[in-house]
Every structure is written in structure tokens, then in C-alpha cells.
Amino acid sequence: MAASAGAGAVIAAPDSRRWLWSVLAAALGLLTAGVSALEVYTPKEIFVANGTQGKLTCKFKSTSTTGGLTSVSWSFQPEGADTTVSFFHYSQGQVYLGNYPPFKDRISWAGDLDKKDASINIENMQFIHNGTYICDVKNPPDIVVQPGHIRLYVVEKENLPVFPVWVVVGIVTAVVLGLTLLISMILAVLYRRKNSKRDYTGCSTSESLSPVKQAPRKSPSDTEGLVKSLPSGSHQGPVIYAQLDHSGGHHSDKINKSESVVYADIRKN
């Protein structure tokens, strides 16, 4: 009986260990499912004309559906300051404004949580509104979030950029990429030309510049003249004439020279 009980204990140990691992895995799954990331998108910087309305755009992305627990908070860090001030909060369709004097009676809600939009408007912006604006969104269970930061500049109307900042950034990026591509293509062409010159094994410079003399071509009449005229004082061996007669007549020992016959001059030195 003792032996059987001991065997039962040995068999039960792996079962209990497997059960413990299952519980830990389930708990870890609940923790990771309960807290997920939420992404916030804002422009890096915007320019607003003095005395006009400025819109602070804030979009967010969440895997969870927005509802009564979704909230939006805006805070402000004045230019040159190290601390931030919360001046706006939105939750369950209600707007809660802070007591910060520079924003009194200037803030209005311009977003739509169903469209993942948490933007606000600021009326009659002044130079005191220069600084950094922070957009923070909570949408449980998506609560782990990196807030969006906007650097806002209030300037005179004549100092407003001709193009929006994002357009300027896009143009500069396109120009840099284009120049990089052009330089890469030029370097590739130069590299290929260099390799082609290195692999070429043709004639040398002196050989390529040496003129090539070709012997003049002789016509049948020139051959006949060569037979008639021989250099004076030179030793001449026997000359043999060969005549090809295509007329079909009888053979003759007499050589009749004509324009249609080619004569061969064979000399023996």
C-alpha cells in the first residue's frame, strides 16, 4: 500500500506543476490584454497669426472603442518655463476648463471622440500663448500612452510661412532624397567607366596612332603594263605567260594579248 501511495504522489506532481503554469499563463494574458498602447498624433509645430484663432489638432489611435471612460486633457508649457499647466479637460461630453488666465474664455472643443479626434480651438491668440501644448488621451483599457507635443508660434500676419510647415518639410525631404539619388547614379556611372577602362586590353597609343598603308589595287591593264615595262639593268629570268581562252577555239602557241585576258608574270631571281 505504501508503494502504491508513493507512486500516486509521483504521478500527481507533474499534474500540479502543469496546473500552476496554466494559471500563470492565464494571469499574464489578462495583464497584457488589460493594458495596451494608445498612439497620439499631433503636428510638431504650427504658426498662428496674432489675434486670430488657432486650431490644435490631435488625433489618436486605439484598439478599444471610445465610450464614457474616454477622456482628453490639454496642458500648456509656456515658452522658457519648466512647468506645465492643465487648462482643458473633456470627458463624457462635458468640457472642464482650468483657471489659467491666458486661456479664459478662449478655449472650445473641436474634436470628435467617435472619429478619434481630440482637437481644440483657441480664440484670439496672443504672444503670451507661445509655447508647447500637450495632448493626452485615455481610453481604458488603453491607458499606456505617449502624449502628443505641439510647438506653437504666434507671429505677425506678414511673418506667416508661405507654405505650411509640413509642406516645407516634405519639399526639403524630397529635395534631399532626389540629390542623394542623383549623386548615387553619377558615382555608379563613373565607377563603371573606370572598370571598363581597366579591363580594356587593346592596342597601345603608339600603335593606334601609326598609319596603316595599303597597297594600291591593280587593274588588269596595270598587269599588262607591268609585263611590258621592266626595270633597266635588272636581271630578268624567263617570263611565262598564261592565257585563258574561253572562246572554245583551237589551241595556238601565239599569245594574243587582249583586255579580257589576265597575264601572270612569274620571275625567278
Curated annotation (Swiss-Prot):
A GO cellular-component term linked to this record: focal adhesion
Cytoplasmic topological intervals: 184-269
Topological category with respect to the lipid bilayer: Single-pass type I membrane protein
Modifications after synthesis and translation: Phosphorylated on tyrosine residues upon stimulation with pervanadate and concanavalin-A (ConA). Phosphorylation at Tyr-241 and Tyr-263 is required for interaction with PTPN11/SHP-2. Dephosphorylated by PTPN11/SHP-2 (in vitro).
Biased composition (Polar residues): 202-211
Region (Disordered): 199-238
Alphabetical list of Gene3D superfamilies matching this protein: Immunoglobulins (2.60.40.10)
Positions occupied by motif ITIM motif 2: 261-266
Localization per record: Membrane
Entry text on domains: Contains 2 copies of a cytoplasmic motif that is referred to as the immunoreceptor tyrosine-based inhibitor motif (ITIM). This motif is involved in modulation of cellular responses. The phosphorylated ITIM motif can bind the SH2 domain of several SH2-containing phosphatases.
Protein name: Myelin protein zero-like protein 1
Gene transcribed to yield this protein: MPZL1
